[in-house]
């Protein structure tokens, strides 16, 4: 790593630590030429391929925004939404792919959102799965009821 002070082409790693829930690695470095220290941050880039074929970086902020819209007017706090977004990011990063289709991000949102708030889940699913009729909603509600009964909640 090039020293930002003297431009020496090499440096020594003094310390490495994980940051941002393990998504980043912060390295403290020392330059053997001038002796100054500096910090670098490394992050594995995760790209999302949209339906149009356009690729963009994964954004936890976009997840939070979409889930927040689905939760509007519901008793769901910002901390719960942030935790859900973190779970989604961990799930998609665990797949080990550098790129993944936006469809997989949506699927990763549905499970945790269903556990968080069923009404918000229905709102999100209706957009994500392009519900076109009441029958689509009824089918999804029946699936939720069946799952609740299976878990012993109904």
From Swiss-Prot:
Start and end residues, zinc fingers (unnamed): 3-34
Cofactor binding note of this UniProt entry: Binds 1 zinc ion.
GO biological process, one term: negative regulation of DNA-templated transcription
Alphabetically ordered keywords of this record: ATP-binding, DNA-binding, Metal-binding, Nucleotide-binding, Repressor, Transcription, Transcription regulation, Zinc, Zinc-finger
Secretion signal, residue range per the UniProt entry: none
PROSITE patterns reported for this sequence: ATP_CONE
InterPro entries named among the record's database cross-references: ATP-cone_dom, NrdR-like_N, RNR_NrdR-like
Functional description taken from the UniProt entry: Negatively regulates transcription of bacterial ribonucleotide reductase nrd genes and operons by binding to NrdR-boxes.
Listed name of the protein: Transcriptional repressor NrdR
UniProt organism field: Salinispora arenicola (strain CNS-205)
